[in-house]
């Protein structure tokens, strides 16, 4: 009797969990055509704020708990010629960092946005730059620490390919100035590259500097570069590469354990076949490399992950996507199989500038990264390129960098219009990490959900309720707005809408 009662309780709990998964859509507005640039700012109380830009019009839409648009706030203080907008959200307000060009001057300005989408106080000018040309690309990079207490804008003048001139401006969370620095980074060759920039909780800037033989080859030498919060110099720390070369390097500050974690796919020598995962740790206290591992990918995981490739080339189309740090010092990485197929004679594929590669080289004067907002359609400008996003590999490592488990989420996606509908997003609900992506098995893509538990087991969740109403999801641009809530942009009859998913 007790066992039967327990079974009933467990079953009821399971059905309750399934019923809790629901999707609520916003109504489409004819002003929100699919070319609209947007940024999901975050949730304030039960409202969700979304920034929108179309040509020279900038607004913030307020959606209530039922995803009804209750207000659209005009941002009339933003000028024309906008080149980039970034947001950082706090519990009671957010900062909007925007860039624009007027004549020959680029401005970087901050506006404080309240929960109702209206500005608090007057915009703050953070920096300006004189340039001699007209540009639609962003000039400044905006980064912030994990705890959001340290904020930085920075720009790089690489007109002199032997000496990159950095200007960094460090602020606290209220945008009080903490430090302005101008620092020169020596460069050895025009094929040198810089990785994405990161900021740790102490305000230290970190990034990577790689040396390549040519523009499309592997990294032969690699340095971790650090600028301490109050320093005016770079500290350059060589990373040991023992007869291997590297692919794209991801660097993350492990603030809980006082270290920097570096991860990359590696190749043996100068070959073009990915052999495994490279892992390095830099200890902040001792200022030394604390761990350095080259972890081969065995045949079992290659067989599971390979897709259309043979065993040896199983990972040649994979790109590292995320490093998720655990408090115990371990970490999880995800990698996705991304490639293009070309139906014409020209092939635009280049691994080093593909799918939003963060790298900057000497051809990018005053420029780093992309526009930073919206979503792309048909990047190559022709209809002969098909974008593909297939399997996701998830690997868990302990604090010493030893592989604990790995698993593969199988999917097959393609899009001829760009990258908007393919790839995935993750939602960390505490009990598991959920992967949301479009399933292309049927004629129209439908949103699928799979979860990975802490022991690496994959759980294929039932189809979410309230799907199939003509909405095409764009999961790669989603934003988690609560422990078990995510806002996902959608296309509906050629218009931009949004869906709220509660788990």
Named regions from a protein language model:
Residues 1-25, 503:
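Bacterial Sec-dependent N-terminal signal peptides
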Residues 32-41, 79-89, 129-143, 189-197, ...:
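Repeated scaffold domains used in trafficking and secretory/extracellular systems
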Residues 32-148, 152-159, 163-167, 191-193:
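Post-signal peptide N-terminal segment of secreted/secretory-pathway proteins
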Residues 39-55, 87, 91-104, 141, ...:
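Short beta-strand elements that form the blades of beta-propeller/WD-repeat-like
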Residues 56-62, 103-111, 161-168, 214-225, ...:
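Structural motif
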Residues 108-116, 165-176, 219-232, 275-288, ...:
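Beta-propeller blade signature
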Residues 238-250, 291-319, 406-424, 455-483:
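Conserved blade-ending motifs and adjacent loop-strand segments that build the rim/top face
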Residues 265, 320-340, 372-393, 416-457:
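Loop/turn-rich, solvent-exposed surfaces of beta-rich toroidal or solenoidal domains
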């Amino acid at each position: 009797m007790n066992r039967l009662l327990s079974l009933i309780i467990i079953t009821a709990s399971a059905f309750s969990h399934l019923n809790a998964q629901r999707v609520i859509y916003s109504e489409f507005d004819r002003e929100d055509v699919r070319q609209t640039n947007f940024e999901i700012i975050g949730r304030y109380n039960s409202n969700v704020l979304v920034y929108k830009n179309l040509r020279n019009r900038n607004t913030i839409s307020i959606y209530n708990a039922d995803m009804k648009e209750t207000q659209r706030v005009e941002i009339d203080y933003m000028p024309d010629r906008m080149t980039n907008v970034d947001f950082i959200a706090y519990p009671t307000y957010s900062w909007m960092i925007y860039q624009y060009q007027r004549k020959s001057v680029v401005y970087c300005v901050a506006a404080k946005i309240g929960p109702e989408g209206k500005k608090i106080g007057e915009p703050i000018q953070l920096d300006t730059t004189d340039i001699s040309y007209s540009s639609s690309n962003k000039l400044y990079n905006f980064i912030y620490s994990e705890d959001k207490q340290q904020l930085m804008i920075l720009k790089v003048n690489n007109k002199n390919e032997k000496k990159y001139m950095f200007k960094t401006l460090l602020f606290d969370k209220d945008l009080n100035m903490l430090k302005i620095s101008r620092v020169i980074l020596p460069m050895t060759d025009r094929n040198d590259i810089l990785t994405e920039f990161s900021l740790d909780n102490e305000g230290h800037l970190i990034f990577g500097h790689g040396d390549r033989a040519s523009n499309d080859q592997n990294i032969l030498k690699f340095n971790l570069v650090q600028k301490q919060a109050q320093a005016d110099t770079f500290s350059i720390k060589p990373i040991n590469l023992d007869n291997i070369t590297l692919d794209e390097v991801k660097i993350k500050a492990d603030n809980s354990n006082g270290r920097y974690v570096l991860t990359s796919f590696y190749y043996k020598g100068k070959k073009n076949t990915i052999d495994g995962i490279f892992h390095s740790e830099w200890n902040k206290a001792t200022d030394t490399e604390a761990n350095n591992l080259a972890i081969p990918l065995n045949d079992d995981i290659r067989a599971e992950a390979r897709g259309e490739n043979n065993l040896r080339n199983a990972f040649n189309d994979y790109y590292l996507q995320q490093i998720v740090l655990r408090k115990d010092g371990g970490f999880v990485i995800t990698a996705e199989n991304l490639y293009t197929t070309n139906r014409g004679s020209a092939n635009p594929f280049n691994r080093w500038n593909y799918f939003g590669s963060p790298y900057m080289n000497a051809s990018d004067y005053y420029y780093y990264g992309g526009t930073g907002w919206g979503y792309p359609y048909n990047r190559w400008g022709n209809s002969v390129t098909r974008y593909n996003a297939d399997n996701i590999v998830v690997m868990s490592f302990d604090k010493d960098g030893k592989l604990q488990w790995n698993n593969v989420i199988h999917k097959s996606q393609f899009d001829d219009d760009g990258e908007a509908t393919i790839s995935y997003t993750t939602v960390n609900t505490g009990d598991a990490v959920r992967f949301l992506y479009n399933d292309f098995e049927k004629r129209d893509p439908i949103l699928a959900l799979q979860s990975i538990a802490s022991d690496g087991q994959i759980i294929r969740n039932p189809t979410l309720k309230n799907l199939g109403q003509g909405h095409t999801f764009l999961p790669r641009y989603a934003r988690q707005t609560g422990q078990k809530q995510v806002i996902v942009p959608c296309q509906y009859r050629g218009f931009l809408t949004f869906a709220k998913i509660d788990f």
